[in-house]
């Protein structure tokens, strides 16, 4: 059976913030996605976080595998946010299958990044392009 791409969307139902404003959500999300990937063997190709949730692109054998990954992420979010005194009462998980067309995957990743930046009030055009020399030293 060939592996397929899935997009997993986890979002608070009541549109409340997923994390408190003084909490480093980016580091937390990287931690829980890496942990879920290690526990389930599912490869995640990228994620985008929003004030009210997150979306991930996964590389799975089946929808069941994608669901296991999503459940692991959801459990980690609930346990961690509960421990810092910010309980998420309800959030929904949606799993959708992508095609194997890499352009589709790239388009989805770009869309996720754009929406994530927009949620933070950033403009795609305002992000500077970084240039590096042959030794990896930052030029600008």
Where are each of the predicted segments found?
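Active-site-flanking beta-strand signature of metal-NTP-handling nucleotidyl enzymes
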Residues: 3-15
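Active-site-proximal alpha-helical element of nucleotidyl cyclase-like catalytic domains
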Residues: 22-41, 76-78
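A short linear hydrophobic-aromatic micro-motif
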Residues: 41-47
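A short glycine-enriched loop-to-beta-strand structural element that forms part of the catalytic core
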Residues: 47-55, 84-107
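Helix N-cap motif at beta-to-alpha junctions
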Residues: 61-66
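Short amphipathic alpha-helices in soluble, non-transmembrane regions
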Residues: 69-75
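Short catalytic/binding micro-motifs of nucleotide second-messenger systems
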Residues: 76-84, 119
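Catalytic/regulatory signature loops of cyclic-dinucleotide turnover enzymes
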Residues: 111-132
